[in-house]
C-alpha cells in the first residue's frame, strides 16, 4: 500500500491539510485540489491510485465529478471515497450508485479514514500481480522476467527490466526522476538523478523503433509510459 498516490479534493484547506498529514504519516503521497476543475487536471496528469472526493464543492459538485470519472474508460478504475457532512441514507445510496467505492461522513478520525482507504485499495487493487502485462505486441512476464516484442525476446538489463515493469504497471502517469529512483532503485540507494536518463535511453533502445515512443519525456517533470502520442 505504501507509495500509493491519493488525490484529496476538498474546498476547505484545513481539511485537506489534516487529511494530507494523516496520509503522509501512513506512507502515502498526497495531491490536492480545491474544486472539480483542478481535480480533473490533476487526475489527467497524475492518475492517482485513489480519490478522496468531497460531496459539496463550489461549481460542479463532487458527485458530478464522480459520475464523469466513472464514464471515462481512462479513469473508471480509479477508486473513489466520498467525503461529506451529509449522513442521510439517500445521499449515501446516490454516491454509491454513481460508482463511489466507499463513503465517509464528516467529522471522521484520521485513523478511521486511513483504515477505510486501505480497505478500498485492497478491494480494488489488481487481483494478480504475477499476470503477464501486455501493451500491443509488447509483453512482460513477471514470473519468468522475460520481455517479448511481437513474439521475439527483447534483450535488456535488470535495471531496464525493473523500469519497464514499473512503467507498465503505472501507465499514463508522469513521474519525476526522483520518484523513479525511489520506486525502481529503492529509497536507500544513492544514485544521481541523471542515471535515470541513461537507463531510459537504454530501455528505449531495447524497445526498438516501434515501441520506444511508449516511454515519453514530460518536459519539466520527468517521464511517463503512455500509449497516447
UniProtKB/Swiss-Prot annotation:
- Please report the name of this protein according to its UniProt entry: Phosphate regulon transcriptional regulatory protein PhoB
Spell out the Pfam families in the cross-references.
Response_reg, Trans_reg_C
Q: Name one GO cellular component term.
A: cytosol
List the gene name. Answer: phoB
Q: Which domain of life is it from?
A: Bacteria
Q: What happens when the gene is disrupted?
A: Loss of swarming in the presence and absence of phosphate; double phoB-pstS deletions act like phoB deletions.
Entry keywords, A to Z: Activator, Cytoplasm, DNA-binding, Phosphate transport, Phosphoprotein, Transcription, Transcription regulation, Transport, Two-component regulatory system
Q: Which CDD domains match?
A: REC_OmpR_PhoB, trans_reg_C
Matching NCBIfam families: PhoB
Q: What does this protein do?
A: This protein is a positive regulator for the phosphate regulon. Transcription of this operon is positively regulated by PhoB and PhoR when phosphate is limited.
Q: Where is the Response regulatory domain?
A: 5-121
Please name the taxonomic classification of the source. Bacteria, Pseudomonadati, Pseudomonadota, Gammaproteobacteria, Pseudomonadales
